[in-house]
Each structure stands twice: as C-alpha cells, then as structure tokens.
Design a protein with these regions (language model features):
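N-terminal amphipathic, basic-rich helices that act as targeting or association modules
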Residues: 2-151, 298-336, 627-670, 675-676, ...
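Long, structured ligand/cofactor-binding scaffold of large enzymes
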Residues: 57-257, 269-272, 374-377, 396-485, ...
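Terminal amphipathic helices with adjacent charged low-complexity linkers/tails
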Residues: 85, 103-158, 289, 295-402, ...
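Conserved short loop/turn motifs at secondary-structure junctions
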Residues: 91-96, 290-297, 316, 325-333, ...
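Mobile "lid/hinge" segments at catalytic clefts and subdomain interfaces of large enzymes
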Residues: 200-347, 353, 437, 442-454, ...
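Extracellular/luminal Protease-associated
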Residues: 258, 291-298, 524, 746-747, ...
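Acidic, glycine-rich flexible loop/linker segments
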Residues: 567-584, 795-868
Length: 894
C-alpha cells in the first residue's frame, strides 16, 4: 500500500523495535486530547478504539464515536453503532466455499451489466482453511488417515476445484489445503500475528490484528488478545468487498478469575463449568473479558479452550488481554522473535498489556478455579454440567429408559452404551496438557490389558499436525492406538457431524430395540442430531475422560467408584489407577514440545500434495458452471435483481410454517450431518441418480441450493408444535391440515401466493454460525421470524438474507397467546419504512375470526442492516452498490 497516512487527530507516533521503525495511532495521545481515562476502558474496547482511530480519516468513523467510546462512562456509548474494519477474514470450507460461490455469482451479475467481473475481488486478506469436509469413514487402523483423506479428495473434487479457481482469481485469498488441521487451531498456532503491519509509502504502520471469522468458534483467538468474533458468510461478504462491519458497542462483562485448579482437573472441566456459570449469569451478546489473579494459573492453551466456547456461554467474545503468557506462547509456537518483540513493544506503548488494575466493566462475574471438579456436559447442551457420579442419573432423567449398568463380558448393545468416542475439536486438541494426559491414560490402560469396548467407534482427529508430532515425540501414539484411538484425519470430523457410518450391526441393533445410545466427545457442542442420526445424545468431556469412557463403554458406569474393566490378572482397574499426575503430564509435555516442532510442522502448510495441486480448475474470470453438477450450482440470490430497489410492503395473511420451542439451534434449522434417504434432500439426490451411499453430508453439499433448501428444518430431532408428538421436518399445511414435509408445504404455499413466517421461543438460532440456516429460511419463502429472543449470529444472518427478525415483548409468547399454527398473521408498519428498533404490529387471526394484536420489536439493529433488508439481503445490496458507482468496463480483448 502506497497511500500516505491520514492523521486528523494528531495521534500518529513512532515506535522503534530493534532496528525497525514503525508508526502507530496512539491511544494514550487520543485519551490525552479527549481528557479521558484510558485505564477505565476494558482491553477489548481499547482494541476497538484503535480501530476507529485508525479509520478516522477515511470518512467511515465519526469523531463523536471515538469520543463516546473513549469516555467509557458516557451513557451514549453502549449500543451505539460504529464502523469496524477487520484486518482479515477467516473461513472454514463449510462456509467459505459457499461464499466463493456467491462471489462467483456476483461476478456473473456484474459481467451481465457490462462491467469487468474482476472488479469483484476481496479487498482485505482472507484465509480459507479446508477442515470441515473430511469424515471418519475408516477408523481403528493405522491407515485410517490415508484412507479417509483419499475418500475426502474423491468426494470433494468438484468443491475443491472451485477453491483452486478462486486461488487463481483472488490475490488476497490464502488457502490451507486439506489434512492440515482445524481453522481455529491453525489460526491460534500459526496465522494470528497479534500485531500486524502495512506499508504506506516510507512508513510501516503497526496495528492490532483483528478479524471476523465465518464460524462461531472464531473467538478462540481472543486468547491471544486478538479482537475477533464469528459471523455468517453473509455478513463476511461485506468485509471482503472493503466495507466496514456495523458493530453495536457491546456490553462488556468482566469475569474475575481467582484461585488455582485442583489436581487432576482438566481445562475442559473448567470451561464446561464456566459455560454453566456464564449462561446462568446471562452474558448473551456481551463481550466477556477475563481478569484477576487466577489468570496466572491459566496457560495460553487453557485460555484458548475457554475463549473457544464463547458461543456456548452466549458471548460475542471471550477476551484475554495480552500479558507475559501471551508472549511466552508466541515464542513457544515458533513465531519470529522480531514479531514477538513487536507485539510486546506495541502492547506496552498502547496500554494493551494486562495485569494491572481492573477496567470499568458493566458488571463482574466471579469464578474460582479451585471450585471446579471433573465434569461432563450433556446430553444435548454444553451448559448441562454433570459430575462423574451423577452421569448415570443424568442419562436416565434425559431418556427415561430405566436402564441399569450391564455386567462385564460379552453382551448385546444396551441403553446408555457409548457407540462413538472421539478425541476431536480445536477446543481441546489445541491444549497439549490435555492431549498428553489422554495419551498417558491410554498408555497406562494398555499396559493393564484394557481397550475400548467392541461397540465403541473410536477416533482421533486433532486440530493440527503439531499434535501428532508431539505425541510421537512423547512416545504416546502407540498407547492411544492400543485403545483404538488411531489418527483418522486432521479436521473437524465428529465435532462437526463428520463421524462417518456406524457398523451395520450396531445401527440395526439400535433401530431394532429403539436404543438410547450415546456419543462421548472432547468437543464444544452436542446439539441433538449433530453427531449421528442413530445417536440420541452426546456428552462432552476432556480427552482423558473420552478414553476412559471408551474403555467403560457405557455412561451407566460411575467411574468415580466403579472399575473401567478387569485386567489380565483379574484385578479391577479404576480410573484413579490410570489417571496421570499433573507433574507427570508437565514433565512429558516439557520434553516433547519445542518451537522447532511448530516450525517444522507448519513449514509446508500450503503445499497440499499432488492430490490437491493436480485438481482441474478453470482459469476464466467468470466461473464455468456445470449444469449437471450436484455439488456446485449457481446460487439464485441475485436472480431477478435489478438496479431498482423494490418497495417494502406490510405482510398480510401470512401462515406459520413452523411453531417451535426454546433453544432451536442452527443445527435444527440446517443440519450438517449425513443426508437421510427419506428426507426431501435425499429424494432429490435419488431422483438425480445419486446412490444413498454417495449422498455425503449437508456440509459437503452446501454449494447446491437445491439440496440445502430441502434440508432446511429437516433435522431428525426438530420438534414442530404444529405436529404434536412427532420429530423431524414435518409441518401441517393450512387450512387443509395435511401433514407434509416442511419443504413440500413451502412449495404449496408459494404456488398459492401465501407469505410465510416462523414462530419460536427463546434463544432462537443458537449454535453454529451456519449461514445456510438463514439462506434456507429465505429460500423457503419465509419473510419474518417471530421469537422471544435471538442468538446474535443467526439474527444477523437472517437480516443479511432480508428476513425480518421480530421479538415478542416481555411476558408475551406463542404460549401466552395460545397460538397453534392455524392462525393467519398480519405484520403492519413495515410499509412505513424500516428503522432500527422500530415497532411492528403483529395481528394473529384465528380461523373463527378472533384476533390478537401484539407490538413486536424489530431486531434490525443498525441503519446498515435496514439497508440490507430493503435490498432483499447483503448480496443484492453489494451488487447494487457496485453498479451504482462509475462502471468498470470490461478490458479490451476480454
């Protein structure tokens, strides 16, 4: 970049680090000029303040916004909209490839206007990590990794060819090929610079790294003091084309950490307990910033585990300030010493180093590390904490089977059995202490002659290659393999619904006896239907506990007092006999890990091997769509979109497509796992000649809108109150009352010209960022969602697709109104113009003509979001914005 730096507020200052001179926009200088106290500002908000200051000269940031944020006690700052400019965008392939497809369709639309399609190009750096597509088809053998990788490349050749095309077209795109790890762990260990630089003529500008990530676990990088959170691909598109992301200045809740952990307590135990505490405290949409004396007892990987689960405790971010542990971790993971020196010098100059007096928080939640004991969470929510002795009762309460623990020895599959046990997820495989502990426990168990029960499908899918290199160096790989935990891939796998098939005999036994069987994962979420269609529930646990429960084989074993099994000498083996001491774990870890281990394993990150580099791909600036492809189809979101903005009208005579309860997840709305043969998406694939064995997953087919719209609200565990007593994607078509699939009902309503809404309870859209939960909603013809409350990312995604989110007033709900789905609904006031926080009148009319009127809060939160909805979504908004400026002609000869 060669443009000179603007300095309208006279805050540009030099910073000498070694032999290099940088410049930076000084927060202390700004605070002095405004007469504000920088030390009162939470550290996360200091990073945001610098972002606003750096863009104060480009016309997107008002001086009043800077002043309001800097005066942290000013009443107008909280909830105010500011323009945030992320330094980069991070995306996994699950949401990244659909975004690349959206960009390809935008190029088509721009080219149709006579403009150069290459004008559609990312304006800021974007990293795409391919991690969501690999499945655990093969497990339990030393060649499982190679076989799963071969299957992945074969299944996804069409999808990956899109990525190869995009790599040729988009200069700002960096791609991490398959089989390298999970996006958030790679971001933590390698990609994140913490402080980044850009050159402006002779000046080298230093500023904090920041990002938006197209996955709800993006806040994992908050552990490094990096400002970033999860958004949908819909919203990320605006950042990629160079527009700021509209951000409401959040509530910042301090979490004061004290004490030290008890012996044998893993960080998984800490984060699951903390998730329950923060959910109870209520931090929805807030930034949780950690401080206090207990931070000294948390390693950077511990902090990353805690920050990773911000979405699970409902926060936008889980932020840790930079401190000495941050600098130690950067050095330990092989970062350049000059970069580590820059991070320290910059953080000190900008008052971004933690450890001093606590800033001013909206409120403080106390958390004592010493109060934590080993726990699990489940069977369907991450905040459902349960201690080891209480696990059998938790299962019986959830599934009411009356099951009892089975005797040891050969037997039939039973209620409470664990059929999938997986050490997976960036949440915990990024934590070396926990992985070494799992390896030591497995080694100890193998030495006693124990192994996983035969009905348990075991797998190990770490988030980076460093993990397996560390286990090899520690001599622990063989022990894990002896229990059954062979490497199956580097990717999300079981955590994201890619657990692969169960053996036919297991599946048949589950179906025959209607068994409530379970999964045991070292993961971050366990929503219904996510892991496997045959698995009724999932418990989250630390990696060593996953190994232990694979050996026990059932959640009806109380591992706090019952043995895991019997050794070769006939002696009972208890968990305490196998559990390694903290001192042993620390010693083994210290000998196995080094900065060079990280450097070696990240040296060839972008290579990909011949299976990747040899993929055929087009070279033209517009993508060559294959009309016969069932993986890649041109999306319809710009079909019929012209230069003229259509008017917004009131909604009259709309029908509810679904009537849903509380805590509807984006997995319920848009499942990511295997596509069932009897579902509308499966029937579509069958009709197009695809055998059920080749259906793959919804994640893999996200670039085919025909599959995805049929998969919307098709989760096998979703419960629509319009069809009482049933599970799955069914609804009642009105007024005839016929029970049909959600997709079929939507088709019938569209043919009749009937508008649609969804009515739901509290916490609607929690879970994954999953933009297809909003895209599918829009493609079904749903104009609005009426709920008691919304989770942050899904609310934003709905707005980004032109769907209006409306909240019932406090004390009013579908139940208090007695709604049953037979009503018609009018939404009045929309035609008067969309405004943030406006009131919309909802009128519910029963079949007998009786009507109730309710004032609804329109959850369009910012003026920018109102623009998106007026345009019918972000993509039409970006398209119209591009064609409204001076056109970029197609180059001669193109």
């Amino acid at each position: 970049m060669s443009t000179a730096l603007a300095d309208p507020l006279d805050t540009l200052r030099p910073l000498d680090v070694g032999a290099t001179r940088y410049v930076y926009y000084s927060l202390p200088a700004l605070a002095a000029s405004l007469g504000s106290d920088l030390e009162r500002l939470p550290f996360s908000m200091r990073v945001l303040l610098e972002n606003l200051l750096r863009h104060a000269g480009d016309g997107t940031v008002a001086t009043a916004d800077l002043a309001a944020l800097a005066r942290w006690d000013a009443p107008e700052r909280e909830g105010a909209e500011v323009a945030f400019h992320p330094a980069r965008v991070l995306m996994p392939d699950s949401s990244g490839i659909p975004l690349l497809i959206d960009f390809a369709s935008l190029r088509d639309a721009v080219a149709a206007q006579g403009m150069d399609p290459q004008a559609v190009n990312p304006r800021i750096p974007v990293d795409l990590v391919i991690d969501h597509s690999v499945r655990a088809d093969h497990t339990g053998t030393v060649d499982a990794f190679a076989r799963n990788l071969a299957c992945e490349m074969d299944r996804n050749a069409e999808r990956y060819s899109v990525v190869r095309w995009a790599m040729e077209q988009y200069d700002a795109l960096r791609v991490i090929p398959p089989a390298n790890g999970i996006v958030h762990q790679i971001n933590l260990e390698y990609l994140a610079p913490v402080v980044t630089t850009t050159r402006h003529g002779e000046e080298l500008l230093a500023f904090p790294d920041s990002l938006v990530g197209m996955d709800s676990h993006t806040p994992m990088v908050n552990a490094l003091g990096v400002f970033g959170w999860g958004v949908g691909g819909i919203e990320a598109a605006t950042a990629l084309v160079g527009q700021p992301v509209g951000l409401l200045v959040p509530l910042v809740v301090g979490c004061r950490v004290s004490g030290t952990r008890q012996a044998g307590v893993m960080c998984t135990d800490i984060v699951l307990t903390l998730t329950r505490v923060l959910r109870t405290a209520g931090v929805l949409g807030a930034v949780v910033e950690f401080f206090g004396p207990g931070l000294a007892a948390l390693s950077l990987p511990d902090r990353a585990t805690i920050a990773n689960m911000a979405a699970e405790y409902g926060a936008t971010m889980g932020f840790f300030p930079i401190d000495g542990e941050t600098l130690r971790y950067l050095a330990a993971t092989g970062r350049d010493p000059a970069q580590v020196a820059l991070v320290e010098a910059y953080a000190r100059a900008q008052h971004l180093m933690g450890g001093g007096a606590a800033p001013a928080f909206a409120r403080v939640v106390a958390f004592d590390l010493g109060s934590v004991h080993p726990v699990l969470a489940g069977p369907s929510r991450p905040e459902q904490c349960v201690s080891l002795p209480d696990l059998p009762a938790s299962f019986r309460h959830a599934f009411a089977t009356g099951a009892e623990a089975a005797p040891a020895g050969p037997r039939e599959l039973r209620h409470g059995d664990i059929v999938i046990a997986s050490i997976a997820s960036c949440t915990n495989t990024s934590n070396p202490f926990q992985i070494i502990a799992a390896g030591l426990l497995a080694r100890n168990a193998a030495m006693r002659g124990l192994t996983a029960q035969p009905w348990v499908k075991t797998s190990f899918s770490p988030g980076s290659r460093v993990v397996t290199a560390m286990l090899d160096a520690a001599g622990l790989t063989a022990g894990l393999q002896a229990i059954g935990f062979h490497l199956v891939g580097y990717g999300c796998m079981s955590c994201g619904g890619g657990s692969g098939p169960l053996p036919d005999a297991i599946t048949a036994a589950i179906a025959r006896d209607d068994l409530a069987v379970l999964g045991m994962l070292s993961s971050n979420r366990n929503f219904e239907g996510r892991l496997h269609p045959s698995v009724r529930g999932t418990y989250l646990a630390s990696p060593p506990l996953v190994v232990a429960y694979a050996i026990a084989g059932s959640v009806l074993h109380d591992l706090s007092r019952q043995p895991l099994g019997i050794d070769a000498a006939g002696a009972p083996v208890h968990l305490a006999n196998l559990w390694p001491s903290d001192a042993e774990v620390t010693a083994v870890l210290g000998a196995a890990q080094s900065p060079d281990l990280f450097r070696r394993n990240y040296a060839a990150l972008a290579d990909g091997g011949p299976g990747w580099t040899g993929l055929a791909h087009g070279a033209a600036p517009v993508f060559a769509w294959d009309p016969d492809s069932l993986y890649i189809k041109r999306p319809p979101f710009l079909d019929g979109v012209g230069a003229t903005l259509p008017p917004i009208a009131d909604l009259r005579g709309a029908r509810p497509l679904l009537l849903l309860g509380d805590d509807v997840t984006t997995d319920h709305i848009s499942p990511g796992g295997a596509i069932p043969a009897g579902a509308p998406a499966g029937e579509y694939l069958l009709a197009h000649g695809v055998a059920p064995a080749e259906f793959s997953t919804y994640v893999a087919r996200r670039a085919n809108h025909e599959v995805m719209v049929r998969g919307t609200f098709a989760n096998i565990r979703i419960r629509n109150e319009m069809v009482a007593g049933s599970e799955g994607g069914l609804t009642r078509h009105m007024p005839d009352g016929a029970i049909v699939t959600v997709f079929d009902a939507a088709v019938r309503y569209r043919a009749a010209g009937v508008s649609l809404v969804v009515i739901a309870g509290a916490n609607y859209g929690c879970g994954s960022s999953r933009d297809w939960a909003a895209k599918g909603t829009a493609l079904l013809g749903i104009s609005a969602v009426l709920a008691e409350s919304f989770e942050r990312i899904h609310r934003s995604n709905l707005v980004g697709m032109g769907v209006i989110p409306l909240e019932f007033p406090p004390g009013v709900s579908r139940r208090s109104l007695g709604l049953d789905g037979t009503e018609t609904i009018d939404l009045l006031g929309l035609a008067d113009g969309l405004r943030p926080g406006m009131e919309v009148t909802a009128r519910f009319v029963r079949p007998d003509g009786a009507a109730r009127t309710v004032p609804m809060l329109c959850r369009i939160d910012t003026a920018r979001e109102a623009d998106w909805v007026r345009h019918g979504g972000i993509l039409p908004y970006v398209f119209r914005d591009m064609i409204s400026v001076a056109p970029v002609p197609v180059p001669a000869g193109a």
